[in-house]
Amino acid sequence: YISTFSKAKSTTVKSNLSVKQMLNAIKTDNSGAKQIKRYTDGGVNISKYKTTYDKFKAIYVWHAKNFKKHGWNCVGCNSNFNNCLAALFAKSQKRYDSFITLEAGKVKNNDGSRPIHKWAAIYLAGKPYIFDPRLQGYTKSYTPTTYFAIAKGSKRAKAIYIYENGYGTFYPDE
């Protein structure tokens, strides 16, 4: 109940939090569970998880482990991943700053080449974080947790990749 004297406050994500804390500041329900189950061949049931971070991570890890089985290239995998995230955040009242899909055509590697790639990027507290379940393929360790949130300013950023596009420059992060 909100009286005429009350003000409803929206949640804004604080900037000094970890990615986990920032994702958990975004309240999500299970309304997208059916869609996510369909997109993941029944592999992810977000209703089993309590926090937004755990739901998000389950979707991420499923894609990282199963993209080869489905014969997906980067674009196919990330299109499906983005569909899952869109379903997860559908009723979150956009408490994150913005949710964008970065298309491969707008992106350049630091050597000028164009990767055939696509990401889900979420602005949390004004900073872009790219969540890409396939980026672990660029490292020697193929575990799905090699990369989770990609943010600007990591120690290893310049040694690996710099991505440029209309939204700014993105640096991979651990």
Residue ranges and their predicted role:
Residues 4-73, 83:
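Secondary-structure boundary elements
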Residues 32, 42-43, 94, 112, ...:
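Intrinsic-disorder/low-complexity loop/linker signature
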Residues 56-64, 121-124, 151, 160-163:
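Extended low-polarity, hydrophobic cluster-rich segments
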Residues 152-174:
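Low-complexity, Gly/Ser/Thr/Pro-rich intrinsically disordered linker/tail segments
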Residues 5, 12-13, 41, 140, ...:
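N-terminal compositionally biased, intrinsically disordered segments and leader/signal-like regions
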Residues 79-155:
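Hydrophobic/aromatic-rich core segments of domains that either
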